[in-house]
UniProtKB/Swiss-Prot annotation:
Protein name: Glutamine--fructose-6-phosphate aminotransferase [isomerizing]
UniProt subcellular location: Cytoplasm
Subunit structure: Homodimer.
Gene: glmS
Gene Ontology molecular function terms on file: carbohydrate derivative binding; glutamine-fructose-6-phosphate transaminase (isomerizing) activity
Function: Catalyzes the first step in hexosamine metabolism, converting fructose-6P into glucosamine-6P using glutamine as a nitrogen source.
Enzyme Commission identifier(s): 2.6.1.16
Domain of life of the organism encoding this protein: Bacteria
Substrates-to-products reaction catalysed: D-fructose 6-phosphate + L-glutamine = D-glucosamine 6-phosphate + L-glutamate
InterPro entries, A to Z: GATase_2_dom (IPR017932), GFAT (IPR005855), GFAT_N (IPR047084), GlmS/AgaS_SIS (IPR035466), GlmS/FrlB_SIS (IPR035490), Ntn_hydrolases_N (IPR029055), SIS_dom (IPR001347), SIS_dom_sf (IPR046348)
Length: 607
């Protein structure tokens, strides 16, 4: 999985396919490949590793054809070797795929019983054989795609070309994004605008459930009900390759909705989702030699490390210190060889965090950095780099980078526990399965977008907001308060729920809403007691909980945001999304500049 490109034109498409794949490298990959149709025949070349290896093969064996597809893959099902690289080819078609097919084992068994042979370990090959079987039954390519699509469970975006069809490409989207590009005498399909920017004049974004039939003469998009639809065209120019909001009003909204996909990319990097195990960090970090972790970060990244503290201490029995990077150097903490210092930053350029990293390096301490920009200064200077793979984040208020930081830290904590002998095999499978469910659950939460917008109408005229959380929900409450401050300019404070009676309760009245982050976990009953205290003082409560929590609360609640029931381990990642949506919609209702809030910068490069 990772990046998709398809081109249908009147000239050889090979060089444009490779150029587009280069523009998708930021998404991360471990193999690549392209396939073309020339004189009705399918041709394919794939390579393990970087794109330069694919280019070397193409120099030796050039591919012809004015119709082709390309792919950069991060291994999910199947190891990172050439045979598992995309495109996958049968005697009837070539296909590229982004996503995960959840029922591929069941479908694979069915196809094997039907006489099909599998050459790879990937879930994508199941799609290829399903469509091929449908074609052999006499269905048209369009009918074969639709019939096969109905059998698939999971999230996927696919682009397919066919043997014997020099003028046909079909794309389908169920989850991961796909954009259609309109160039001069050429049509394109790609994972995002970045891949298409040099070649097209405008793009349209396929919506979830759409599928598209492309010929040189026309493009027809069908919706989930198989009805022809028109999707809005967005002008695109080279300088705006990062400046497309798609069908969203703001970059922040787009980036919140990208979280299911980018977290699936992240998890594929750190987890073996086929075997439900953690990919070992041992080549980077020998956890048996580590007795203490020191986190230093700023803002939202700092809150991600506060969540991680619970994970590392409870799973791996490691002592954890959390510091705001801007204060870290001033207290001169004692550090030695058994300490791992970890620095989290979206940009990898945050001045205070970078200065803290350099401080630790001066003392010979091992340094690891969790960054979204892999070419950043912090990535170059740290001993170990753990990329979040969230993709470009344009909105100043971090959303998808934050949840990808949490996902990275969760995998890191599981690996530490495993290496140190505190994580049994069965428990490892259980926790990895829980993480694997995160993209699906986030998609469910995104369906609450309109409801949350309505709830936020209660916040537009308030003088302040309190956020409460307990356990791993406490850092999420802190992040919620920060987001609301950043975007809406409403004063907001986050507190540990147990601290309410130690001062903040003095603020509680009808004018100060209290947003409570309270999944139904081992701390839920105690948090309910805090809500009782708020209700007794006529406080207005907005409760973010799950179905069990909503049923257990018998209070006069202003509004309740009900999420799916989920395990405690992954709750911080899931509950981050509704607090982002609250901040976003409140800011939109107030008319503030959501993507570029006043006085804030995406990358803080001064101390």
């Amino acid at each position: 999985m990772c990046g998709i490109i398809g081109i249908l034109g009147k000239r050889c498409v090979t060089s444009s396919l490779v150029e587009s794949l280069k523009r998708l490298e930021y998404r991360g990959y471990d193999s690549s490949g392209i396939a073309t149709v020339h004189n009705g025949r399918l041709y394919r070349i794939r390579a393990e590793g970087k794109l330069v290896h694919l280019e070397e093969k193409l120099q030796k064996t050039p591919l012809k054809g004015n119709l082709g597809i390309g792919h950069t893959r991060w291994a999910t099902h199947g190891v990172a070797v050439e045979r598992n690289a995309h495109p996958h080819v049968t005697e009837r078609l070539a296909i590229v795929h982004n996503g995960i097919i959840e029922n591929f084992v069941e479908l694979q068994k069915e196809l094997i019983e039907d006489g099909y042979t599998f050459e790879t370990e990937t879930d994508t090959e199941v799609i290829a054989h399903l469509i091929t079987r449908a074609l052999k039954s006499g269905l048209s390519p369009q009918e074969a795609i639709r019939t096969s699509w109905k059998r698939l469970q999971g999230a996927f975006a696919i682009v397919v070309i066919f043997e014997g069809e020099d003028n046909l490409m079909i794309a389908a989207r169920s989850g991961p994004p796909l954009a259609i590009g309109y160039g001069k005498d050429e049509f394109f399909v790609g994972s995002d605008a970045i891949a298409l920017a040099p070649f097209v004049d405008s793009i349209s974004y396929m919506e979830d459930g759409d599928w598209a039939v492309l010929t040189r003469e026309d493009i027809t998009i069908y919706d989930v009900d198989n009805q022809p639809v028109k999707r809005p065209l967005t002008p695109l120019f080279e300088g705006a390759l990062l400046a497309s909001k798609g069908n969203h009003r703001h970059f922040m909204h787009k980036e919140m909705f990208e979280q299911p996909e980018v977290i699936s990319h992240n998890l594929a990097h750190y987890l073996d989702l086929g075997n439900y195990t953690v990919r070992s960090f041992q080549k980077l970090i020998d956890w048996k030699k580590i007795n203490r972790i020191l986190f230093a970060s700023c803002g939202t990244a700092y809150y991600s490390t506060l969540v991680a503290r619970y994970w590392f201490e409870s799973f791996a029995a490691l002592s954890v210190d959390n510091d705001v990077a801007s204060e870290f150097r001033y207290r001169e903490p004692p550090i030695n060889s058994d300490v791992l210092s970890v620095f989290v930053s979206q940009s990898g350029e945050t001045a205070d965090t970078l200065a803290s990293l350099r401080y630790c390096r001066e003392y010979g301490v091992k340094t690891a950095t969790i960054v979204n920009v892999e070419q950043s200064t912090m990535a170059r200077e740290a001993d170990f780099v753990l990329p979040t793979r969230a993709g470009p984040e344009i909105g100043v208020a971090s959303t998808k980078a934050f949840t990808c930081q949490l996902a990275t830290l969760a995998a890191m904590a599981l690996d530490a526990a495993k290496q140190r002998g505190f994580l049994a095999e069965q428990a490892e499978h259980q926790f990895v399965q829980q993480l694997a469910e995160v993209p699906r659950i986030l998609n469910e939460v995104l369906k609450l977008d309109n409801k949350i917008e309505q709830i936020c109408r209660n916040l537009v005229n308030v003088k302040g907001v309190l956020y409460l959380g307990r356990g791993t929900s406490y850092p999420i409450a802190l992040e919620g308060a920060l987001k609301l401050k950043e975007l809406s300019y409403i004063h907001a404070e986050g507190y540990a729920a147990g601290e309410l009676k130690h001062g903040p309760i003095a603020l509680v009245d009808e004018a100060i809403p209290v947003i409570v982050v309270a999944p139904y976990d081992r701390w839920f009953e105690k948090t309910c007691s805090n809500m009782q205290e708020v209700a007794a003082r006529n406080g207005r409560i907005i409760l973010i909980t799950d179905k069990k929590g909503a049923e257990a609360v018998h209070l006069d609640i202003l509004s309740t945001i009900v999420l799916p029931n989920i395990p405690e381990f992954i709750a911080p990642i899931i509950y981050a999304l509704p607090i982002q949506l609250i901040a976003y919609h409140t800011a939109v209702l107030l008319g503030t500049d959501v993507d570029q809030p006043r006085n804030l910068a995406k990358s803080v490069t001064v101390e």
